[in-house]
């Protein structure tokens, strides 16, 4: 990615990363949850009790304990101590002094404990846990006493256990063994032992034992003796005694601490009869259930009085029947009358038993068992259920009527549910049961804890899950990442689309057009690198042209790399249109050839005045730079159609891949004349090593692309057949001062372009050995054909180098300074777009010089030449930029000239209106030719269709065959040429391949009669 990508990664990344960091941190935070709830504990022994509480959450929650709903103070570490993990240690206080003081101290730590975990996201409260302290004092409240009983009588042993928590249970032992109770004869009422109809075997030692979690306590041993009854006479006397029960009165209970005792009644009776009073009286009572009910068995209680006594062991809310019976020993008297007494109801003295909670389908089921019968204190009319207020459920109560012992509570949110149950009588609700709690976990937590138990998700559970902070944070992070990825993709697509825009700089790493159009075996190419030196070169320096082919020691090693890549073409590359590139380069090195005398039929060309010829070559026009070219000898005949067929249509012809663009200006031919060759010494051919100024070992005819630098792995351009060069005509003899350079375009009748009329230019001037003459073309570039390349061939083995004066003269010419020429306006052609530079074909200067020496009229070849004259104005800035490249080429510095030409084509002249002319002049100065842009089209077949220029035939006798080159041909030629020059040998051996190529290029000098 380019700088935009760097900016994206370097500038836009920190903000998303910071947001992800913050949101990720929030995603880890969670509200507190109670994992381990405290359990009921009992302080016993000397060790402390532990209330455990575990919670989870992020940040880690703070644990706080509450006692009976109030925050627990940690100011007394001897009673409470909080461990770092949240566990609460409860120490048992030391019991000293009176029991009353001990109870006050214990009440400070007894109660219901709850654990509260809180952080910045919320608070969680655990279920309540009750702390109990097991206490059992030493002293019994009532000790059993020694008793003497008579067989058949009732026996009561009273026992008051010591105070303790929990309330101690009382059991009786006889002779060191637990006493076996017998319903109806041996029963325990309260804490007292009652024996009805005592028997002889009931005698023994009885002991009361109190037991709770704190331990057990034993009372003193009481001795019981059962004696035989008195004489039978006493029994008969008792039958005459009459007992009248007068009153049964309910006694008010005395305020006592601890469990409330049952109700008591006061019985009063009256004895009548002749017999003596009885020794003892027994009270009998039973509960009355209904009139139709036969009633329960009577309960006998021995009274301690003779006319009145207190009777206990009753229950509130019951209807009782009372009566009194006298007795003396084993003798019993008749029973008294029966009195009815209804005891009022009281609140139940005991809570319901077995309270449980279980979760159901969106509800909690509460179930319980009735309290013990002796603690009903009336008729149980229903139950009251209280719910402790917490975060899950507010405080509420429900009433269950009748004997139902179950309640269903609807739940809305997960959490902790704690309930208490109390029995209700006519007097009200009794004692509450111990709080029982149930924790309802969420579905995910429950499934995680117990994977085997699958709980189906409901809509409420799904909503609760989606509302959790971690789920919301995770969703936000995923959404942000998705948006970030979409943004990056859009950015990359738009960034990649910039490289495919129109213009010259549209090259990518893999140019499919170049891959398809280049073949190492068919097309020559430029050297691998173009070395150029920074700065301009002195235009006055001169060197051999052979230095262009070798390494220039003045060029630095870090010079620019070639614009062309020699990477092999990738197979299977589709044929795509190329609407913004020039075509590739072809370099043909033409070997030197001896000068050939011009034909006497060649018409004389118009010459410049001697004052111009003596100093420098005149500037051609505002469309071109001063150049010196030699005319090539006649070419071998091979039309593009034949070349196309010979190559079996393997080359992608330029005319097939781009539309034919018509020129906007008339066709013009430029000609330069090196100088008069009328003198004898000039007409003679110099030696190979003479080194004369007029000698040129070779000429380079090249055509290459001027455009942006291609990627190194771009494939080679497709090779094209070289078109025939313009016809070389012979002028008058070298002694004739009037030399003419005439050239015309030859086109078949099928050519859509109109044929240019014959133009003969005549000019006279004094001959000079060093004079150079030029016939200037019109300011427009020619556009002969878009299907062939321009090739320039030398006729003379000379390469002239301009002097600084000549270059300066060319640059100083203005539009108003015209050379004396006879202008013949050529036939106008169809206009071409300004961006199309057309086909430029010029003869070499040496050829023009030969034609000037030949003199004479115009033969058959004259009709094929066209030399429209024009003035030579001062070049535009774009032309001046390109002139630097041409000047470098004149000084044997082809790499620098190439770099100058490319640098002048980097886009600075794209807005110049003279760009077409300047580029044509510069290209023509180097022997280059540019093809028009191809139209946007897509080739569907790998083989090119027939060229639309296939029928365009050039001269029947002068045409150029299809050149087949190897990619390393130029390097081999350079090495061979340099080695031969270093050894003093001719540039080309007679039997070498270069000679054959040279013969191809130069050919034989046509005779005067072959002009047709």
Curated annotation (Swiss-Prot):
<feature type="domain" description="Ig-like C2-type 2">
    <location>
        <begin position="138"/>
        <end position="225"/>
    </location>
</feature>
<dbReference type="InterPro" id="IPR003598">
    <property type="entry name" value="Ig_sub2"/>
</dbReference>
<comment type="subunit">
    <text>Interacts with SLIT2 and ENAH.</text>
</comment>
<feature type="compositionally biased region" description="Low complexity">
    <location>
        <begin position="772"/>
        <end position="791"/>
    </location>
</feature>
<feature type="compositionally biased region" description="Low complexity">
    <location>
        <begin position="534"/>
        <end position="550"/>
    </location>
</feature>
<feature type="disulfide bond">
    <location>
        <begin position="159"/>
        <end position="208"/>
    </location>
</feature>
<keyword id="KW-0393">Immunoglobulin domain</keyword>
<feature type="region of interest" description="Disordered">
    <location>
        <begin position="533"/>
        <end position="553"/>
    </location>
</feature>
<dbReference type="GO" id="GO:0061028">
    <property type="term" value="P:establishment of endothelial barrier"/>
</dbReference>
<comment type="similarity">
    <text>Belongs to the immunoglobulin superfamily. ROBO family.</text>
</comment>
<dbReference type="GO" id="GO:0038023">
    <property type="term" value="F:signaling receptor activity"/>
</dbReference>
<feature type="compositionally biased region" description="Pro residues">
    <location>
        <begin position="592"/>
        <end position="601"/>
    </location>
</feature>
<keyword id="KW-0037">Angiogenesis</keyword>
<dbReference type="InterPro" id="IPR007110">
    <property type="entry name" value="Ig-like_dom"/>
</dbReference>
<dbReference type="InterPro" id="IPR003599">
    <property type="entry name" value="Ig_sub"/>
</dbReference>
<feature type="glycosylation site" description="N-linked (GlcNAc...) asparagine">
    <location>
        <position position="390"/>
    </location>
</feature>
<dbReference type="Pfam" id="PF00041">
    <property type="entry name" value="fn3"/>
</dbReference>
<dbReference type="GO" id="GO:0043537">
    <property type="term" value="P:negative regulation of blood vessel endothelial cell migration"/>
</dbReference>
<dbReference type="GO" id="GO:0009897">
    <property type="term" value="C:external side of plasma membrane"/>
</dbReference>
<keyword id="KW-0221">Differentiation</keyword>
<dbReference type="Pfam" id="PF13927">
    <property type="entry name" value="Ig_3"/>
</dbReference>
<dbReference type="InterPro" id="IPR003961">
    <property type="entry name" value="FN3_dom"/>
</dbReference>
<feature type="domain" description="Fibronectin type-III 1">
    <location>
        <begin position="249"/>
        <end position="346"/>
    </location>
</feature>
<feature type="glycosylation site" description="N-linked (GlcNAc...) asparagine">
    <location>
        <position position="681"/>
    </location>
</feature>
<feature type="compositionally biased region" description="Low complexity">
    <location>
        <begin position="745"/>
        <end position="759"/>
    </location>
</feature>
<feature type="signal peptide">
    <location>
        <begin position="1"/>
        <end position="27"/>
    </location>
</feature>
<feature type="glycosylation site" description="N-linked (GlcNAc...) asparagine">
    <location>
        <position position="247"/>
    </location>
</feature>
<protein>
    <recommendedName>
        <fullName>Roundabout homolog 4</fullName>
    </recommendedName>
</protein>
<dbReference type="InterPro" id="IPR036116">
    <property type="entry name" value="FN3_sf"/>
</dbReference>
<dbReference type="InterPro" id="IPR036179">
    <property type="entry name" value="Ig-like_dom_sf"/>
</dbReference>
<keyword id="KW-0677">Repeat</keyword>
<comment type="function">
    <text>Receptor for Slit proteins, at least for SLIT2, and seems to be involved in angiogenesis and vascular patterning. May mediate the inhibition of primary endothelial cell migration by Slit proteins. Involved in the maintenance of endothelial barrier organization and function.</text>
</comment>
<feature type="glycosylation site" description="N-linked (GlcNAc...) asparagine">
    <location>
        <position position="762"/>
    </location>
</feature>
<keyword id="KW-0675">Receptor</keyword>
<keyword id="KW-1015">Disulfide bond</keyword>
<feature type="glycosylation site" description="N-linked (GlcNAc...) asparagine">
    <location>
        <position position="201"/>
    </location>
</feature>
<feature type="glycosylation site" description="N-linked (GlcNAc...) asparagine">
    <location>
        <position position="783"/>
    </location>
</feature>
<keyword id="KW-0325">Glycoprotein</keyword>
<feature type="region of interest" description="Disordered">
    <location>
        <begin position="711"/>
        <end position="801"/>
    </location>
</feature>
<keyword id="KW-0217">Developmental protein</keyword>
<dbReference type="InterPro" id="IPR013783">
    <property type="entry name" value="Ig-like_fold"/>
</dbReference>
<keyword id="KW-0597">Phosphoprotein</keyword>
């Amino acid at each position: 990615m380019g700088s935009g990508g760097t900016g994206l990664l370097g500038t836009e990344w920190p903000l998303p990363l910071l947001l992800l960091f913050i949101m990720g941190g929030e995603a880890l935070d969670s509200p507190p949850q109670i994992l381990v709830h405290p359990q009921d504990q009992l302080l016993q022994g000397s060790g402390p009790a532990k209330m455990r509480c575990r919670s989870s959450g992020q940040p880690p929650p703070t644990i706080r304990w509450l006692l009976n709903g109030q925050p627990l103070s940690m100011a007394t570490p001897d009673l409470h101590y909080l461990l770092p993990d949240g566990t609460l240690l409860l120490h048992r206080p030391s019991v000293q002094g009176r029991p009353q003081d001990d109870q006050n101290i214990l009440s400070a730590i007894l109660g219901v404990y709850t654990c509260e975990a809180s952080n910045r996201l919320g608070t969680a409260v655990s279920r309540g846990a009750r702390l109990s302290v097991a206490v059992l004092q030493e002293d019994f409240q009532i000790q059993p006493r020694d008793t003497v009983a008579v067989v058949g009588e009732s026996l009561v042993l009273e026992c008051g256990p010591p105070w303790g928590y929990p309330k101690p249970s009382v059991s009786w032992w006889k002779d060191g063994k637990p006493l076996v109770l017998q319903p109806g004869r041996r029963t325990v009422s309260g804490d007292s032992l009652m024996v009805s109809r005592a028997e002889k075997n009931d005698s023994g030692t009885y002991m009361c034992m109190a037991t709770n979690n704190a331990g057990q306590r034993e009372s003193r041993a009481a001795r019981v003796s059962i004696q035989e009854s008195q004489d039978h006479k006493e029994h008969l006397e008792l039958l005459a005694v009459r007992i009248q029960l007068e009153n049964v009165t309910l006694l008010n209970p005395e305020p006592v601490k601890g469990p409330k005792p049952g109700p008591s009644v006061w019985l009063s009776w009256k004895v009548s009869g002749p017999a003596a009073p009885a020794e003892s009286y027994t009270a009998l009572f039973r509960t009355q259930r209904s009139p139709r009910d036969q009633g329960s068995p009577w309960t006998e209680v021995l009274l301690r009085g003779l006319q009145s006594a207190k009777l206990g062991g009753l229950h509130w809310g019951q209807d009782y029947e009372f009566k009194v019976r006298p007795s003396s020993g084993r003798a019993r008297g008749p029973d008294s009358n029966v009195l009815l007494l209804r005891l009022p109801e009281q609140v139940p003295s005991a809570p319901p038993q077995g309270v449980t909670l279980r979760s159901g389908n969106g509800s909690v089921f509460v179930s319980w068992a009735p309290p013990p019968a002796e603690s009903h204190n009336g008729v149980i009319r229903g139950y009251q259920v209280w719910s402790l207020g917490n975060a899950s459920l507010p405080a509420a109560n429900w009433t269950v009527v009748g004997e139902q012992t179950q309640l269903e509570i609807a739940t809305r949110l997960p959490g902790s549910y704690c309930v208490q149950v109390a029995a209700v009588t006519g007097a009200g609700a009794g004692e509450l049961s111990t709080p029982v709690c149930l924790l309802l976990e969420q579905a995910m937590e429950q499934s995680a804890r117990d994977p085997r138990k699958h709980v189906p998700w409901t809509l409420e559970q799904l909503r609760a899950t989606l509302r959790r902070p971690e789920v919301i944070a995770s969703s936000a992070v995923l959404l942000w990442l998705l948006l970030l990825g979409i943004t990056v993709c859009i950015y990359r697509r738009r960034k990649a689309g910039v490289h495919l825009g129109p213009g010259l700089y549209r090259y990518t790493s893999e140019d499919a057009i170049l891959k398809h159009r280049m073949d190492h075996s068919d097309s020559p190419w430029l050297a691998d690198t173009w070395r150029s030196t920074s700065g301009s070169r002195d235009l006055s320096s001169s060197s051999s042209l052979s230095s262009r082919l070798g390494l220039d020691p003045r060029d630095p090693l870090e010079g620019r790399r070639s614009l062309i890549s020699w990477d092999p073409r990738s197979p299977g590359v589709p044929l795509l249109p190329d609407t913004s590139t020039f075509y590739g380069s072809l370099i043909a090195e033409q070997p030197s050839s001896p000068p050939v005398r011009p034909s006497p039929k060649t018409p004389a060309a118009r010459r410049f005045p001697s004052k111009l010829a003596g100093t420098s070559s005149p500037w051609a026009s505002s469309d071109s730079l001063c150049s010196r070219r030699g005319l090539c000898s006649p070419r071998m005949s091979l039309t593009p159609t034949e070349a196309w067929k010979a190559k079996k249509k393997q080359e992608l012809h330029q005319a097939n891949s781009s539309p034919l663009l018509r020129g906007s200006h008339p066709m013009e031919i430029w000609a330069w004349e090196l100088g008069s060759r009328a003198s004898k010494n000039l007409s003679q051919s110099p030696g190979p090593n003479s080194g004369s100024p007029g000698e040129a070992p070779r000429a380079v005819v090249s055509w290459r692309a001027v455009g942006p630098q291609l990627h190194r792995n771009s494939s080679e351009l497709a090779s094209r057949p070289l078109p025939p060069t313009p016809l070389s005509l012979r002028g008058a003899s070298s002694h004739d001062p009037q030399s003419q350079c005439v050239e015309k375009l030859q086109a078949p009748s099928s050519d859509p372009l109109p044929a240019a009329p014959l133009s003969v230019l005549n000019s006279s001037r004094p001959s000079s050995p060093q004079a150079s003459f030029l016939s200037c073309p019109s300011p427009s570039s020619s556009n002969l054909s878009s299907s062939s390349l321009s090739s320039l061939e030398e006729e003379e083995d000379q390469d002239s180098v301009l002097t600084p004066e000549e270059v300066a003269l060319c640059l100083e010419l203005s539009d108003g300074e015209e050379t004396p020429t006879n202008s013949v306006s050529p036939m106008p052609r169809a206009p071409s777009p300004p961006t199309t530079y057309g086909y430029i074909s010029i003869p070499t200067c040496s050829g023009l010089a030969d034609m000037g020496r030949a003199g004479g009229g115009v033969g058959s070849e004259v009709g094929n030449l066209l030399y429209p004259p024009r003035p030579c104005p001062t070049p535009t800035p774009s032309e001046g930029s390109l002139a630097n490249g041409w000047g470098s080429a004149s000084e044997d510095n082809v790499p620098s000239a190439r770099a100058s030409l490319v640098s002048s084509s980097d886009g600075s002249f794209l807005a110049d209106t003279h760009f077409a002319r300047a580029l044509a002049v510069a290209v023509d100065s180097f022997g280059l030719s540019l093809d028009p842009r191809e139209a946007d089209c897509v080739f569907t077949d790998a083989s090119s269709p027939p060229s639309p220029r296939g029928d365009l035939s050039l001269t029947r006798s002068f045409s150029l065959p299809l050149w087949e080159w190897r990619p390393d041909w130029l390097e081999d030629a350079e090495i061979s040429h340099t080695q031969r020059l270093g050894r003093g040998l001719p540039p080309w051996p007679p039997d070498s391949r270069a000679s054959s190529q040279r013969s191809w290029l130069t050919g034989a000098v046509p005779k005067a009669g072959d002009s047709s």
